[in-house]
Amino acid sequence: MSSTSPITLSKDGRLARITLPTVSLMALFFLALPIIIVVPMSFSSSESLRFPPPGFSLRWYQSFFGDSQWVEAGINSIVIGVSSSTIALVLGTLAAYGLVRGTYRGRGFLESNFIAPMVLPPIIVAVALYIFFARLGILGNYVALIAAHAVLSTPYVVLLMMLAIRAFDERIEQVALSLGATHLQMLTRVLLPNLVPNAAAAWLFAFVISFDEVVVTMFVSGTHMTIPKRMFNQLVLQINPTITAIATLLIGFSIVAVALAAWMTRGSNGLSAAKA
């Protein structure tokens, strides 16, 4: 017979209900603290980084959009992000389907290899890609940069699309095949149309990963500039309040993209559940 009294359990329960939310709020505040500081500083009227800001101004946003070098870096980031995330979506979706529906040996090993760039330290991936592209003679051009970003973002696409394909009722695929559809017709007319929301979410995640990448970019980009690379160079050479405006824009973009991806995925999960 347990010696623990109901009164003790009740006290422990109340303590847990108080402690867990408190610790969670403290952790959330700690994680959000950089955002709480950076966002107000981006609207500062000061010539230097000061918190709290002495006055309100949009001068640093005007400085960003009025600087041709920043605009060029932004265009590069968008072009590289769109290209690499599209490549990652195609390769990642094909890989995810093979990993989920395949019946061959060694699937676990292949899955581990696909997600390796996500779990390895970025510096290791950067050095490996640097050596590989140098041997191919394409180091420092757009092809290498897009390929490197695709390598980094493909694991996220693989994981998201694997979840989506597992959630899709395989019996629907079997029915389509039994009614005379070829495997390609089943993929293009049955499976993929139902995975459009998940694919869009995976593409957004891949784009965010590419747009924020700096370590691998520093190794393989050569003279090409992206927003994160130029931010890093500015922080090393000269701290400019324009950085806070760019950081605020990136934070806002990332929050909107992730929220949109989560919303699209939730809607598709509901659709899959309804069909099942």
Which functions belong to the PLM regions below?
Residues 1-37:
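N-terminal signal-anchor/first transmembrane alpha helix
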Residues 11, 47-84, 236-237:
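Periplasmic/extracellular loop-to-transmembrane helix junction in inner-membrane transport proteins
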Residues 3-13, 82-114, 131, 170, ...:
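Transmembrane-helix boundary motif in ABC transporter permease subunits
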Residues 2-4, 33-68, 220-222, 276:
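Short membrane-interfacial helix/loop motifs at transmembrane-helix boundaries
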Residues 38-48, 149, 198-232, 247:
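Non-cytoplasmic
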Residues 7-10, 49, 53, 58, ...:
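Membrane-interfacial helix termini and adjacent extracytoplasmic/periplasmic loops
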Residues 4, 10-16, 61-69, 211-263, ...:
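Interhelical loop and adjacent transmembrane-helix boundary motif
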